[in-house]
């Protein structure tokens, strides 16, 4: 069995202690300003399709997962929505959901009903990413 010097043992111990003290956080992928598909009439808002498949939820044929990337100052006008679940991945947005305003911050989740309306605006100084799971009839 090889002998380990006191100096090596202390160095290894300090390295392990330092590594365990650093918190590791998962971070959502931020997108560049030109990634994805530009949304017509909504300057600074881009759509990135992530996945789509059939659903087993009755009344719906498809579920679609996408990210909406809002550059600072970008606005999505209040418009009719289909059923969906929204999750704030990065940044912060001012949301109007059926006329009720609120601030969506990182990790917030909310829903939209069929026939309801929603608008969003990025009033912060950094890009924001909203992940959307759309339920399509």
Model feature map: region roles:
Residues 1-17:
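N-terminal secretory signal peptides and thylakoid transit peptides that target proteins
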Residues 64-80, 113-114:
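Conserved short histidine dyad/triad with adjacent acidic residue
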Residues 65-67, 85, 109-111, 132:
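Conserved hydrophobic/aromatic beta-strand scaffold that supports enzyme active sites
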Residues 81-99:
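Glycine- and acidic-residue-biased ligand/ion/polar-headgroup-sensing regions
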Residues 98-115:
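Short acidic-glycine-tyrosine-enriched beta hairpin
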Residues 23-54:
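C-terminal segment of N-terminal export signals and the immediately downstream linker at the start
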Residues 115-137:
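Ligand-binding loop in jelly-roll beta-barrel domains
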């Amino acid at each position: 069995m090889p002998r380990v010097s006191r100096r090596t043992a202390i160095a290894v111990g300090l390295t392990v202690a330092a590594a365990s003290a650093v918190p590791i956080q998962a971070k959502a992928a931020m997108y560049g300003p030109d990634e994805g598909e530009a949304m017509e009439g909504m300057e600074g808002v881009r759509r990135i399709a992530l996945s789509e498949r059939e659903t087993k939820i009755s009344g719906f044929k498809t579920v679609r997962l996408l990210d909406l990337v809002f550059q600072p100052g970008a606005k999505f006008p209040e418009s009719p929505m289909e059923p969906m679940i929204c999750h704030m991945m990065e940044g912060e947005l001012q949301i109007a959901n059926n006329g009720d305003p609120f601030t969506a911050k990182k990790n917030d989740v909310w829903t939209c009903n069929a026939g309801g309306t929603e608008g969003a605006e990025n009033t912060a100084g950094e890009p924001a990413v909203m992940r959307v799971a759309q339920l399509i009839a």
